[in-house]
C-alpha cells in the first residue's frame, strides 16, 4: 500500500511537474491541502483521490481504498479496506 507521499510524487512525475504548487494548479486542489497531505496532517478525501488518480492514469477506487485503509480507526476497518485495495490491485477494472 502506498503512502500519500508516494502518491503525490507519482502524480508529479506523471504530470511532469516539479513542485507541489504546480501539481495543485494542475489538479485544482489547493496548495495548502497538498501541503497538509505531504506533512501527514490529513489524507485526501474521495474527490481529491479521484483527481489524484486521474493525474496518475489510475483507477480512483484503488486510491480511495488505500487512503481509507490508512485513515481507518479500527483493525477491522483497516483489514477491510486493505483487502479491497489488494483485490483492486490484483484485478483492476
Model features per residue range: what roles?
Residues 35-36, 50, 64:
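Key DNA-contacting residues within the recognition helix of helix-turn-helix
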Residues 15-36:
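Short alpha-helical DNA-recognition segment
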Residues 30, 41, 67-71:
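The DNA-recognition helices of helix-turn-helix-type DNA-binding domains
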Residues 17, 40-54:
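Short, basic-rich loop-to-helix N-cap that marks the start of a DNA-contacting helix
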Residues 65-93:
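Short, charged recognition helix plus adjacent turn
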Residues 32-35, 42, 61:
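Key DNA-contact positions within bacterial/archaeal DNA-binding proteins
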Residues 1-18, 22, 59-65, 80:
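A short, Lys/Arg-rich alpha-helix, primarily the initiator
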Amino acid at each position: 500500500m502506498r503512502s500519500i507521499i508516494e502518491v503525490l510524487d507519482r502524480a508529479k512525475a506523471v504530470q511532469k511537474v516539479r513542485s507541489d504548487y504546480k501539481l495543485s494548479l494542475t489538479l485544482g486542489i489547493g496548495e495548502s491541502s497538498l501541503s497538509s497531505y505531504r506533512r501527514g496532517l490529513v489524507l485526501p478525501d474521495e474527490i481529491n483521490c479521484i483527481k489524484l488518480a486521474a493525474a496518475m492514469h489510475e483507477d480512483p477506487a484503488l486510491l480511495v481504498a488505500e487512503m481509507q485503509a490508512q485513515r481507518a480507526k479500527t483493525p477491522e476497518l483497516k483489514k477491510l479496506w486493505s483487502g479491497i485495495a489488494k483485490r483492486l490491485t490484483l484485478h483492476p477494472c
